[in-house]
Amino acid sequence: MNLLILEGISISPYVWGTLIFSFIVFGVGFTLGGFGGMFSECSGIINIALDGSMLLGAFSGLLVCSQIGDALKGNELLNNWAFVNFIYLIGLFVCVIVAFAFSFLLSFVSIRLKADQTIVGTALNSLVAAIVLIGNTIHRAADLPEMDVSMFYNVMLYKFEDMDFFNGMFSNLNITIIVGIVLIVVLTLIMNKTRLGLRIRACGENPAAADSVGIKVNKMRYIGTAIGSVSAAIGGYIIFTCLRLGEWTLTSGVFGYGFLVLAIEILGNWKAKNITFAALFFALFTSLGTFMTTAFSGGVKAFYNSKAFYCMLPYLLAVLSLIFFSKKSHAPKAEGIPYDKSAR
């Protein structure tokens, strides 16, 4: 195996391939998470619960996939790429259903009860973290199979002979990443090119004017929040299933990425194209968290060999970016304001 060796750094082509794959996965996951915030907030609902959506989507989808995989342990079907990806699609379907139901917790309390949306979103994040933690604890106490999808790893559509770079890129490729890329294109077109997208944006900018031409503002807000929650949940599910994160734990999964995509959404100025570029920027630095500790040998100073430093880097950059660029961001004018038809 050929190695690139530079002053204590030993990097194999396989590792370079996994870096690029991680970059793509994080890019897709973060973009979908950012789109989740965009759809919700462009309709007029502040969605702080993106982290909860990503966490719940990853947990529910993984739970289904791991149970199906364990039930079929030892079966030749688990060596079939198409069948394994069918299991991933089942998990994705469950993820969508759970996220769709979860979205109504935020939208109902925000629209019907007119509660403070920031507080509601924060509470929902805490609720989901507690549900996932308790669910995982009960799962372990019941002596059920471990929650992981490691039985699906290395089930490749095609293995490249003597081409470690491409094997690294495609070693854990599954259909969810393809679905994610297609979904990014579809959601971009919906927001920018369709009547539904125009109506959603109108409800976030000037709900009174939208109502005056017959648009049902609250209905559009329910739809925007539902699309946003599902999009973020799929992003979380893709990140966990495409990257080799192993057994589920609250901190080794997607916990915390929702707050990063909030920053991505703000930096993207609630526009699909800008959110995509911002997501790719942060995806690069997030993927470095794993890559650096794999690539560097022990000859490099401990500071540069610290995974914690590189895992912290995207969040540090998010804070700095918000400090310098947040003044240029323009949120929807009616964001966070419950619509009262009588006050029109």
Where are these regions (language model features)?
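Hydrophobic alpha-helical segments embedded in the membrane of multi-pass proteins
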Residues: G27-G36, G52-G57, A101-F104, K219, ...
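Cytosolic-side transmembrane-helix boundaries in multi-pass membrane proteins
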Residues: E205-S212, V217-K219, T293-R344
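Alpha-helical transmembrane segments within multi-pass membrane transporters and channels
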Residues: G74-A129, F281
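Membrane-interfacial amphipathic/re-entrant helices at transmembrane-helix boundaries
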Residues: M1-G33, I46, S60, A71-I90
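Short loop segments and helix-boundary regions at transmembrane helix junctions
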Residues: C42-I46, F102-F160, K193, F255-G256, ...
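Helix-loop-helix "hairpin" substructures at the membrane interface of multi-pass membrane proteins
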Residues: G168-W248, F277
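Transmembrane alpha-helical segments in multi-pass inner-membrane proteins
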Residues: C242-Y315
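Transmembrane helix-bundle core of multi-pass membrane transporters
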Residues: V128-N192, T251, G298-K307, G336-R344
